[in-house]
Amino acid sequence: MLTIGTALRPGATRVMLLGAGELGKEVAIECQRLGLEVIAVDRYADAPAMHVAHRSHVINMLDGAALKQLVAQEKPHYIVPEIEAIATDMLVELEKMGQHVVPCAEATRLTMNREGIRRLAAETLQLPTSSYRFADTDSAFFQAVRDIGYPCIVKPVMSSSGKGQSLIRSEEHLQAAWEYAQQGGRAGSGRVIIEGLVHFDFEITLLTIRAVDGIHFCAPIGHRQEDGDYRESWQPQAMSDIALQRAKEISAQVVTALGGFGLFGVELFVCGDDVIFSEVSPRPHDTGMVTLISQNMSEFALHVRAFLGLPIGTIRQYGAAASAVILPELTSQNITYRGLETALIGDTQIRLFGKPEIAGKRRLGVALAVADNIETAIEVAKKAAGNIEVSGE
């Protein structure tokens, strides 16, 4: 039976978030609801989750020694990675020393780079995926592209939010694509994956929860991407019963193989009744922010319940809902927001993340809406997001 101590007291139950962005902030809030003591960690100060944590630290999370030292200092009961750029080998070591890594250290290690999870899905589990090759030199890259054929996609094996990704349509794009991929990796230049282009009707995120009371699924989430990052997401995404069942079967296989308790964001391509595995994150997914308004329990609440070893019970979906990002372009270390009175009309909500600065384009918030149908929900969310005026000095 779970015992939760009182935060800031000797018997506190401590949760350390590795990554303190907008997703980590919502996880921190859900932890606070249960009286957990929250320690937020990121590479920069004043990150969103730090605003709602009991304590915060700024370290290079790719530095295993620094991470180990901080864990020894804080003695968390749960280590919750919220981003990929972490010294995952150290997480494996810490788990062997008795630390509880969410969902488990092996899941974070495998999913930190696209090679680990692709080989697990395609080679170990024999799941349908796009054709693929890996390369770590320009000559191997050029040969891999020739093997896959045009058009194809190149991505660093370690990157996020579309960084370093490009679509290659012909040989003239090869050199530029290689150089861009080398610039976009989280750990600097290195290995890339080359994937054959999948022709699909739509892409979904199937939020899959592995918990003490079994495997649970949220309704499928559709989304639109631009420049490798999501712009709008909606729930539920309409799809055939056969495709949904196949999506659930694939997702269940993946999360079972990864192990541990928590919420996983499984990305899948859907073409008619066929489903192809794309990627998985062993943590809440950015497209899943729509669940802040669309369900009785958000993806963040579900993640916390699961990793604490609590039952999930019933997930209720409230009908057509959508999210739209607030994505301004400016440079400022003193960001201000206006227009909330206009944005908050009807069944809408706004989340402003509280990021400390912006240089260029950056996701600073999200608008949420429910409506009678998906198309209307998307339009209402987009309009609400567009009504937020962002400025800075």
Swiss-Prot record:
| UniProt: Mg(2+) binding residues | E267, E279
- Record HAMAP family: PurT (MF_01643)
Pathway where it operates: Purine metabolism; IMP biosynthesis via de novo pathway; N(2)-formyl-N(1)-(5-phospho-D-ribosyl)glycinamide from N(1)-(5-phospho-D-ribosyl)glycinamide (formate route): step 1/1
GO BP terms, alphabetized = 'de novo' IMP biosynthetic process
| Annotated ranges, domain ATP-grasp | 119-308
Identification of the protein by name = Formate-dependent phosphoribosylglycinamide formyltransferase
- Listed InterPro entries: ATP-grasp, ATP-grasp_carboxylate-amine, ATP_grasp_subdomain_1, PreATP-grasp_dom_sf, PurT, PurT/PurK_preATP-grasp, PurT_C, Rudment_hybrid_motif
As given in the record, the signal peptide range reads none
Instruction: State its role.
Output: Involved in the de novo purine biosynthesis. Catalyzes the transfer of formate to 5-phospho-ribosyl-glycinamide (GAR), producing 5-phospho-ribosyl-N-formylglycinamide (FGAR). Formate is provided by PurU via hydrolysis of 10-formyl-tetrahydrofolate.
According to the record, the segments passing through the membrane are none
Residue sites binding N(1)-(5-phospho-beta-D-ribosyl)glycinamide per the record: E22, L23, E82, D286, K355, R362, R363
Domain of life of the organism encoding this protein: Bacteria
- Source organism per entry reads Yersinia pestis
Q: What class of enzyme is it?
A: ligase
Q: Which NCBIfam families match?
A: PRK09288.1 (NF006766), purT (TIGR01142)
Name the GO cellular-component terms: cytosol
User: What are the entry keywords?
Assistant: ATP-binding, Ligase, Magnesium, Metal-binding, Nucleotide-binding, Purine biosynthesis
Any idea of its EC number?
Answer: 6.3.1.21
Q: Which reaction does it catalyse?
A: N(1)-(5-phospho-beta-D-ribosyl)glycinamide + formate + ATP = N(2)-formyl-N(1)-(5-phospho-beta-D-ribosyl)glycinamide + ADP + phosphate + H(+)
Question: Which family does the record assign?
Answer: Belongs to the PurK/PurT family.
